[in-house]
């Protein structure tokens, strides 16, 4: 299977896993146009769509794609805001699509019903885990989001994270503000700057790299606690407390 990142909007990625015969699994098509263009240029033929959550920039292209390919299968979380013709999938379920097994992982926090898909060594994390960051908690709680991130962090280090947005440089600015002496993080920022200067995606990225550089996955490290503690209104009694304060800090941060 070949992985393709299709840019959409200002900073979204639509992901496509493409078989040798051109049949493809499409993840989070917020726009139809990039998928239609890939079909025109590369002979890509969508056979199924996977949705991680209901936000418009992740599902907005579904109707047009189903008009173009009426037999297109659709899978997403059990949520009334997901297109009604979707097959609902939940935690622990496995899908076999184009001879590839997709494992469904429940990751509430960004939204209450958010899911991720793990397949062929690739983690399609939607807006839960970002390169050097994590999603805002629009509907979930800090304990939920922390648990979701820990669930993803427990996957093999060679797992490639395919998230929904090109946020690496913006997230790097905050991460370095929190963890300025992290040499691996400094290198990642430099690499990401070079990649973006060349108009290349900074994704996918290995989970091993994220574990070394993403502050939201490093709440057990003393340097992260030390950075967060002065901002906290009360004692940080757990990693969840550290995570919650770190997320509040990120919400307020301006580079």
Curated annotation (Swiss-Prot):
Cofactor: Zn(2+)
Entry keywords, A to Z: Hydrolase, Metal-binding, Zinc
UniProt enzyme class: hydrolase
Enzyme Commission number(s) from the entry: 3.1.2.6
Disulfide partners: none
UniProt GO BP: methylglyoxal catabolic process to D-lactate via S-lactoyl-glutathione
Cofactor remark from the record: Binds 2 Zn(2+) ions per subunit.
SUPFAM superfamilies listed in its UniProt record: Metallo-hydrolase/oxidoreductase
Keyword flag Zinc: yes
Residues where Zn(2+) 2 binds: 57-58, 127, 165
InterPro entries to which the protein is assigned, alphabetical: Clx_II_MBL (IPR035680), Glyoxalase_II_hydrolase (IPR050110), HAGH_C (IPR032282), Hydroxyacylglutathione_Hdrlase (IPR017782), Metallo-B-lactamas (IPR001279), RibonucZ/Hydroxyglut_hydro (IPR036866)
Catalytic activity annotation: an S-(2-hydroxyacyl)glutathione + H2O = a 2-hydroxy carboxylate + glutathione + H(+)
GO molecular function per UniProt: hydroxyacylglutathione hydrolase activity; metal ion binding
Binding-site list for Zn(2+) 1: 53, 55, 110, 127
Its job: Thiolesterase that catalyzes the hydrolysis of S-D-lactoyl-glutathione to form glutathione and D-lactic acid.
Record-stated family: Belongs to the metallo-beta-lactamase superfamily. Glyoxalase II family.
Subunit structure: Monomer.
Name used for this protein in its record: Hydroxyacylglutathione hydrolase
Organism the protein comes from: Xanthomonas axonopodis pv. citri (strain 306)
This protein's encoding gene: gloB
């Amino acid at each position: 299977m070949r992985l393709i990142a299709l840019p959409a909007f200002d900073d979204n990625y639509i992901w496509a896993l493409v078989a040798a015969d051109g049949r493809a699994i499409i993840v989070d098509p917020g726009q139809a146009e990039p998928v239609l263009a890939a079909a025109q240029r590369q002979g890509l033929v969508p056979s199924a769509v996977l949705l991680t959550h209901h936000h418009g920039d992740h599902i907005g292209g579904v109707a047009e794609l189903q008009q173009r390919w009426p037999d297109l299968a659709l899978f997403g979380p059990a949520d009334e805001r997901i297109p009604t013709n979707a097959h609902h999938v939940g935690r622990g379920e496995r899908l076999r699509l184009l001879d590839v097994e997709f494992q469904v992982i429940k990751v509430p926090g960004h939204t209450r019903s958010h899911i991720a898909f793990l397949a062929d060594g690739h983690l399609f994390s939607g807006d839960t885990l970002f390169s050097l960051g994590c999603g805002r908690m629009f509907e979930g709680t800090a304990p939920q989001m922390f648990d979701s991130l820990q669930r993803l962090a427990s996957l093999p280090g060679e797992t490639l994270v395919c998230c929904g947005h090109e946020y690496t440089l913006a997230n790097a600015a905050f991460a370095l503000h929190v963890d300025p002496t992290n040499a691996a993080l400094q290198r990642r920022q430099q690499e990401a700057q070079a990649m973006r200067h060349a108009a290349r995606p900074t994704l996918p990225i290995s989970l091993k790299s994220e574990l070394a550089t993403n502050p939201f996955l490093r709440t057990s490290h003393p340097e992260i606690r030390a950075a967060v503690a002065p901002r906290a209104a009360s004692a940080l009694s757990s990693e969840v407390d550290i995570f919650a304060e770190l997320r509040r800090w990120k919400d307020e941060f301006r580079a």
